[in-house]
Amino acid sequence: MLQSPSSPYPRTITLIGMMGVGKSTIGRRLASQLNMPFSDSDLEIEEAAGQSITEIFARYGENYFRNGERRVISRLIAGEPKVLAVGGGAFMDEETRKLVLEKTLAIWVKADIDTLAERVTKQADRPLLIGHDVRTRLQELADIRDSFYAMAPLHVWTGAQPHEEIVDAIIMALPR
């Protein structure tokens, strides 16, 4: 594990990527190593709405959710620098994507489809996967999203390696 920097990173670091890639887990560890606060936009949305994301999708639909997501992410970015994990679809919204790319350091956290499928099948709370073959649906989403995620200036692969190694790789790649 790398020595923690003496001061936090001066900008918000936003972790983007597919569901199940580990943005929240890696984000918490990265924030700890950088002496920064951590926020997860999905958790912030659930807290603000008093409902789970699955419930929001079921009651109001994806467009309603994305509008709320945009507002929450905008508020989080406007605050103090932090490590921010955003939902897999957040970066598909043009306004959110522009804000993330202009105001934060975006890092695309990547994993292969088989790894993602293995991780998300353990979780029942993924509204975009309900009623679908998980691997097929993840591939469809990746086919749509990857070209947008690729706009992030930093990319990091995840897989079987320990989260500490991924965090160390991110810290070493941070522009200073």
Curated annotation (Swiss-Prot):
Disulfide bonds: none
EC top class, as a word: transferase
Keyword Signal included in the entry's annotation: no
Pathway field: Metabolic intermediate biosynthesis; chorismate biosynthesis; chorismate from D-erythrose 4-phosphate and phosphoenolpyruvate: step 5/7
Catalytic activity as recorded in UniProt: shikimate + ATP = 3-phosphoshikimate + ADP + H(+)
Binding positions (ATP): G17, M18, M19, G20, V21, G22, K23, S24
Single GO molecular function: magnesium ion binding
Highest rank taxon of the organism: Bacteria
Cellular component GO terms, alphabetical: cytosol
Family membership noted in the UniProt record: Belongs to the shikimate kinase family.
Full protein name: Shikimate kinase
